[in-house]
Amino acid sequence: VDRFEQNEKTPVTEGICLLTVVSPRRDEGNSPTGIVGRCLARQLLAMGRRVRVMAEPDQCDDWPDTVDVVEGSITRPLECARAFEGVEAVFLAGAHPSTVQDALVLARNAAASKVVVLSSHGPEYEEAYPPETWFWLAIEKAVERSGIAWTHIRPSAVMGAVIEGTYPATGSDWPDTLRADGVVREAFLNQGHYPFIHEADLAAVVAAALTSDDYTGTVIEAVGPPLSTLSRIRSIAAALGRDIGAVDLTADESRAIWRRLDWPDGAIDVTLYALEEYGARFAELVQWTLDQRPSVHDIIGRPLRTYDDWVGENIDSFR
């Protein structure tokens, strides 16, 4: 049990935590804010925190009863300024560089004491390019200059992204194809690897950053180990109790399939690059994951949930 999943009768003694949630996005580096946000809301409530959610229209349902849901978009924060009233901490997910400053002004006016950014592994690459081209790094820099205590979280791909339909492209069509003909068709099936983290583990990292000063002013690499494509397929097959066919495609063939599924070229490029890179440099990148401090294990106080765990919880999506 997470150290952040305590007795649900814990008394409420803290201010409001505002979580921002947007519709599923397929651009590279995006995490499924709805799935992560719902895990986070449950964990914060179990800690005795008050939770408010600013959610885009298609994300307003299926929250715990005690969550205060306000319809609005963090990409247009001035249209929903009331969501910031009385807020102590903000989980900033789905923000846009063009309007993030408006959100930070509202947070500062509300006397918010902390902003935790759901970022990406893009900033370390964006640094090599002119500031006007930045996306993730622009958001991080704006938060750092806001005068509010901050933490940036750069996660691996989230296991639940396949359910919400967000980045990465690998695995995104598996529920449909497995229901249709029981065959997975992707590039780099044999050597491809991709790093994943369970959404509940990522939420526990966020909960720690929101409710503790231990991680203020730090960048947390919330990374899970690289998983081979074949191991993910085998996990699903074992849970289904049947074999799953696998056809290894060329990168161009995989690209064509993902384009037909409306994936943007940027997300496809990054997915293919990562599958190949993590496969070719597996030992090195596993070591990089193990070397990160604080580790996810350190922060949440238990081993990370596995892909087998996730599949067991979500197997109906593949039936």
State the predicted function of each range:
Residues G72:
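Cofactor-binding loops of NAD(P)H-dependent oxidoreductases
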Residues E253-R319:
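A hydrophobic C-terminal alpha-helical subdomain
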Residues I220-E221, D248, V270-L275:
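Short catalytic/ligand-gating loop segments at beta-alpha or beta-beta junctions
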Residues I236-R242, D248-A251, W263-G266:
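SDR active-site lid
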Residues A89-A93, V117:
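Redox-cofactor binding/interface segments in oxidoreductases and associated redox assembly factors
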Residues R3-F4, T10-Q59, P64, T75-L78, ...:
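Oxidoreductase cofactor-interface core, primarily capturing Rossmann-like NAD(P)-dependent enzymes
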Residues A93-A107, L272, Y278-R281:
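N-terminal glycine-rich "phosphate-gripper" loop used for MgATP/nucleotide binding
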